[in-house]
Amino acid sequence: SMDELKNFRQWNSLTPGHPEYGLTPGVECTTGPLGSGFSNAAGMALGAKMMGSRFNSSDISLIDSRIFVLCSDGDMQEGIASETASWAGHLRLGNLITLYDSNDITIAGDAGLAMSEDVGKRFEAYGWHVQHCDGHNHDEIADCLEESLSVANKPSLIVAKTVIGKGA
């Protein structure tokens, strides 16, 4: 709601600066530095794959989960995100789907101050399935998510191009 957005980065709100497990509904792990949530998600994806290989059989698929993560320009600037993306591509974690909000803004200002590469091409080089969409178009996002769900042998990156504050 708009009331919650007005409480952005405030303690005990639904929109804290650093959401914490157990305090913010829907948050499955606490992160700290930028990029660490992305790395946590890749670890969860590997964990799900490992559990599936142990407990699934040809008759029963007990563990068949997808791990979804939201990332920002600030996340993608961090070294930990590059290392994780390379590792996830190498392991072919097809159950990892990343929605990247590419709005060219970080907390420090314009993302171009610290990053000039094409993130989608970087992820393609790491072996990821990469798609692009208008991040303000729900149908395009849904189509990209649907396609990502059909890719079993590569992690997926959806580069959702947005304009910060659009419609506010």
Language-model region placement:
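Carboxylate/His-rich catalytic cores and anion/metal-binding grooves
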Residues: 1-4
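N-terminal core-entry segment
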Residues: 6-9
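Glycine-rich ThDP/TPP pyrophosphate-binding loop and its adjacent helix/strand module
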Residues: 14-17, 23-168
